[in-house]
Amino acid sequence: MNLPRGPVMVDIAGFALTEAERARLSHPLVGGVILFRRNFHNIEQLRALTAEIRALRTPHLLIAVDHEGGRVQRFLDGFTRLPPMRVLGEAWDADRDQALKLAETVGYVLAAELSACGIDLSFTPVLDLDWERCAVIGNRAFHRDPEAVSALAEALQQGLGRGGMMSCGKHYPGHGYVEGDSHHLMPQDDRTLAQIEQDDLVPFARLADAGMGAVMPAHVLYPAVDSQPAGFSKVWLTDILRGRIGFDGVIFSDALDMAGAAGAGTYVQRADAALAAGCDMVLVCNQPEEADAMLAALAPPPQPQLAERLERMAGKSRAEDWQRLIATPDFAAAQAAVRQLAMPKDALAGPQVGEAH
């Protein structure tokens, strides 16, 4: 079925598509699918699932996952265990050149293993600064220093590219300064724009200049800048991110089922607000009935650049090509280097993030 990608990303329930999910994924407003741990049994099953999703439409639906490392790594069995990004920040403090090499290698292994399973995109890297205030960010952040975060994230972005994947910086303009978790409430950051620009915005601007493919805004309120949370704010998305920073990639909303998004109203109202503010694609997870109701009622604004932006995020090589690459001795050496950085406890340390979503 030839059908342009729409501005909505949805999820699925299990290891394979149901008939209801096939119908939902064939809706003209759908443009992508986000996978979770519940969708993963083993690599063979995952490859079959992504092939099934890709076969539904041309161009294929974007297939995404939160696969950062540490406690946010959805697929474990058969995948290289990835470290939390703080490990790379600690390496930066010891030896900057070595840390940059490690960051590039982590990005490469992360992306190539996913590419070999037919996945287009991981929502990574985390560009939030580690202000030691926000538990849900915590060791997901590289460092407190904007220069360290920028350099390490840019190296990781280069590795992602080598592994066939574009980057998605999050959580714009910075989730690290607030104490609350936007999965459960609406955090508020009372700093001025000048203060945020001096620190938290630096990595976003730096990676935008270096070819970052996408950005995911935070469900955080910055009242000194705008009365709307960043993900629903034309000031943050259109005026600052598009206008001042000059970012021209995809803007994905964070999941609209999060408590931090609830203030925008119903799911249709949330999607309307996010798209009107400047998001290209909205994520609706864990609420299939709400997703269906939203798809029936949503009337998105004109998005003349949507097709081009989403196509940039799509994997360009066949999964089989990546499967051959990850079987090589050189890739095994890269996996070994990454494995030395990670411990199994990393997947459990700190609050679990978004796994219910």
UniProtKB/Swiss-Prot annotation:
EC number: 3.2.1.52
Site (Important for catalytic activity): 181
Compartments (UniProt record): Cytoplasm
GO biological process: carbohydrate metabolic process; cell division; cell wall organization; peptidoglycan biosynthetic process; peptidoglycan turnover; regulation of cell shape
GO CC field: cytoplasm
Residues binding substrate, per UniProt: 66, 74, 140, 170-171
Keyword match Transcription: no
UniProt keyword Cell cycle, yes or no: yes
Record key words, sorted: Cell cycle, Cell division, Cell shape, Cell wall biogenesis/degradation, Cytoplasm, Glycosidase, Hydrolase, Peptidoglycan synthesis
Catalytic residue positions: 183, 254
Record GO terms (molecular function): beta-N-acetylhexosaminidase activity
Catalytic function, reaction form: Hydrolysis of terminal non-reducing N-acetyl-D-hexosamine residues in N-acetyl-beta-D-hexosaminides
Pathway(s): Cell wall biogenesis; peptidoglycan recycling
InterPro entries in the cross-refs: Beta_hexosaminidase_bac, Glyco_hydro_3_AS, Glyco_hydro_3_N, Glyco_hydro_3_N_sf, Glycoside_hydrolase_SF, NagZ_Beta-hexosaminidase
PANTHER family tied to this protein: BETA-HEXOSAMINIDASE (PTHR30480:SF13), BETA-HEXOSAMINIDASE-RELATED (PTHR30480)
Function comment: Plays a role in peptidoglycan recycling by cleaving the terminal beta-1,4-linked N-acetylglucosamine (GlcNAc) from peptide-linked peptidoglycan fragments, giving rise to free GlcNAc, anhydro-N-acetylmuramic acid and anhydro-N-acetylmuramic acid-linked peptides.
Homology family: Belongs to the glycosyl hydrolase 3 family. NagZ subfamily.
HAMAP family in the record: NagZ
NCBIfam families: PRK05337.1
Protein name: Beta-hexosaminidase
Source organism of this protein record: Chromobacterium violaceum (strain ATCC 12472 / DSM 30191 / JCM 1249 / CCUG 213 / NBRC 12614 / NCIMB 9131 / NCTC 9757 / MK)
Gene name of the encoded protein: nagZ
